[in-house]
Amino acid sequence: MSENVELRRAHILANHILRSPRPSSNPSLTPEVCFQYSPPELNESYGFEVKEMRKLLDGHNLEERDWLYGLMMQSNLFNPKQRGGQIFVSPDYNQTMEQQRQISMKRIFYLLEKGVFQGWLTETGPEAELKKFALYEVCGIYDYSLSAKLGVHFLLWGNAVKFFGTKRHHEKWLKDTEDYVVKGCFAMTELGHGTNVRGIETVTTYDPTTEEFVINTPCESAQKYWIGEAANHANHAIVISQLSMNGTNQGIHVFIAQIRDHDGNTCPNVRIADCGHKIGLNGVDNGRIWFDNLRIPRENLLNSVADVLADGKYVSSIKDPDQRFGAFLAPLTSGRVTIASSAIYSAKLGLAVAIRYSLSRRAFSVAANGPEVLLLDYPSHQRRLLPLLAKTYAMSFAVNDLKMIYVKRTPETNKAIHVVSSGFKAVLTWHNMRTLQECREAVGGQGLKTENRVGHLKGEYDVQTTFEGDNNVLMQLVSKALFAEYVSCKKRNKPFKGLGLEHMNSPRPVLPTQLTSSTLRCSQFQKSVFCLRERDLLERFTSEVAELQGRGESREFLFLLNHQLSEDLSKAFTEKAILQTVLDAEAKLPPGSVKDVLGLVRSMYALISLEEDPSLLRYGHLSRDNVGDVRKEVSKLCGELRPHALALVASFGIPDAFLSPIAFNWVEANAWSSL
């Protein structure tokens, strides 16, 4: 280094040390004021009565819901933490898998002590079932691991005993299950078979000399897999197994097997292993079970559908094996109902957090030296959240309608419940996952923190798209049911009745060529276009299958060939069913602000569903100009729903403590003083 360079550096350093700073050229300059949190409630007014909207959305048992929210907020078991000047309750996801499992069980016993589960199995009737649904939904808002464990114990194990069993089983098991003396699990899924229940490989035989059934896992693919509660806590299992009688396979049957003693030791001839860590739901102890010729009493066959007498004679009032299989699966519909319902409450939670955050968080300014703009005032942000909000509203009405049909079910409605619950379960759980992803992105990096809930919920709820039936398979089930109904009515020359197909008895709707704003928002137009879409796809699907069937191919193979048309049809059926529930709810309301806002929500649901489905354009029912009109109207509706955004999420009725810090004063929650 040259001497001149060294001298120059020394001179610069001396100036830094010895000289005073130059006076500012702008002596009046003051530091900019830091960002201040402003609660959305200060700037956003409610344009309708929130309590009335909540009654519509929750549908039933509001007092019981609020009672349970309060119970959870009162106990340290629910991990209360102060953030940003208020208390939040949510699970601690920093706990190990084993800690999460144990705390979930402690929470269950706390709720048991408080009487939350009273009557869940021993009381009957629509009111008792609706109360159970309501309390179950609240548990899921706190933690899906908690509600999943309850679902396994009450809705799978408990309902199996209740609906597959008879008096002898009810007297022995139901009260002890309700009191958690017996802890149950539901062993249906296997390593090699899940949605295809018919293919289950576990085999049960009967020994008439001892009057015992013998359950066996014949190969590794037959091990029971993903069995909730099996890894740690369950002491009894419902075992779904093939029943082999004297070399004849009688198909799927349902048995009770003890897998642990009351001290928690694994029973002889049973092996249990842990499924391990998961992407979510680590408070649920999923396990694997092998049966090595496990012997159980003859009375442990749940015999409402079929029985084996002491001498080994097989008896059933249902002679047809396919009908008998259907009878075994029918009681499982409640699982799809609760999954659909919990998916919507999860979407509500994500939207409440994301929309509240977008009403206080600002970014960029649209004018020189202007104030930064609220996120939800950007049309792009409205477009990403408000259509999902409208869909969540529509699906809330749909799932409430499904629950009412389910609790008032009759043998005549069982088929419709099975079909509708399959479609709703698939569409609503897909909607939930899409909503949570959009909400995670909409809150930026804050969505990565588990305390803010939105991002973590994705891992918790992802399982819903595949358990209790893979969504794609369920959608195929819907289209097959519609196909069978269509063919049956045409063959018998009878009018359509049931599954919402009555509109096909009327002339084919004719859509206007010009779609004005008032036309697009007209409920009759919306219903007509949804009916036309379903009708056209059903006719196309049946025509395609019938044409190819005439060439000698099997119907099942042809369903597979036409899977895309099949999925379009089942989506059209389900979305039309959802729209109808909103129309029904709207029709019951008196004129007023609640009805007006619900009309906007309904129009948004209808039009965004049309915008996202290319089948109407593909088959020529809407022109390219029509599709452009729909797109523009969705954007207009975003602007009209924007002033109601806070009130719409407030109507979810979720207490502040169950949301997250970024839904409130996120500046204070992240301040140094809050550490």
From Swiss-Prot:
What catalytic reaction does the record list? a 2,3-saturated acyl-CoA + O2 = a (2E)-enoyl-CoA + H2O2
Task: Output a single Gene Ontology CC term carried by this record.
Answer: peroxisome
Residues annotated for FAD binding in this entry:
442-457
Instruction: Enumerate the Pfam families for this protein.
Output: ACOX, ACOX_C_alpha1, Acyl-CoA_dh_M
Q: Which cysteines does the record link by disulfide bonds?
A: none
Q: Which co-factor is required?
A: FAD
Any idea which GO molecular function terms this record carries? acyl-CoA oxidase activity; FAD binding
Presence of the UniProt keyword Flavoprotein in the record: yes
Compartment(s) = Peroxisome
* Principal localisation: other
In terms of superkingdom, the source organism counts as Eukaryota
Annotated transit peptide: 1-34
Which GO biological-process labels does this protein carry? fatty acid beta-oxidation
- UniProtKB keywords: FAD, Fatty acid metabolism, Flavoprotein, Lipid metabolism, Oxidoreductase, Peroxisome, Transit peptide
Entry EC no(s) = 1.3.3.6
Q: Which family does it belong to?
A: Belongs to the acyl-CoA oxidase family.
- Known role: Catalyzes the desaturation of acyl-CoAs to 2-trans-enoyl-CoAs.
User: Any idea what this protein is called?
Assistant: Putative acyl-coenzyme A oxidase 3.2, peroxisomal
Q: Which organism is it from?
A: Arabidopsis thaliana (Mouse-ear cress)
High-level lineage: Eukaryota, Viridiplantae, Streptophyta, Embryophyta, Tracheophyta
Q: Which gene encodes it?
A: ACX3.2
